[in-house]
Amino acid sequence: MKRWERWAFNLTAAVVAVTGFVYFWMKNFLASSDPFAVVNHPWEATMLHLHVLTSPAFILIFGIILNSHIIRKLGASRMPNRKSGISSLILFATMLGSGYLLQVGTDAAWLRALVAVHVGSGAAFSIVYVSHLVVSARLGRRRPAVSSIREVA
């Protein structure tokens, strides 16, 4: 994976995660002092807009790293970061599907279920992906000696 791909994916993932968590917090844990208010916080709509508008860039970069990183790693066996990578992939697909369906759903019961799936998979993806990055960073510190041996052999 190229450096710009890693930075673009991490940046868009961070923006989508932060705006999603902040929007969820504003919508569900804040209460407006105005009994006639439609939103609980003045920035609630902005957080939702940033979340929804950043998500396509996040998905685009995911498609790029799918080709340059994920498919190649799926084909390799005994990768030390494999479990968190596969978990991230499954959670990303769940988060993506539920996020898309939230945009087009109309039934109140289905929307509640989709919100639960989207928030749950989004939170889980964020945690698992951060753990994937931490393990990758630790492996990267040990990798130069290992990669030089592989190049010689």
What spans do the regions from the language model cover?
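Membrane-embedded alpha-helical bundles that constitute the cytochrome b-like, heme-associated redox core
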Residues: 1-153
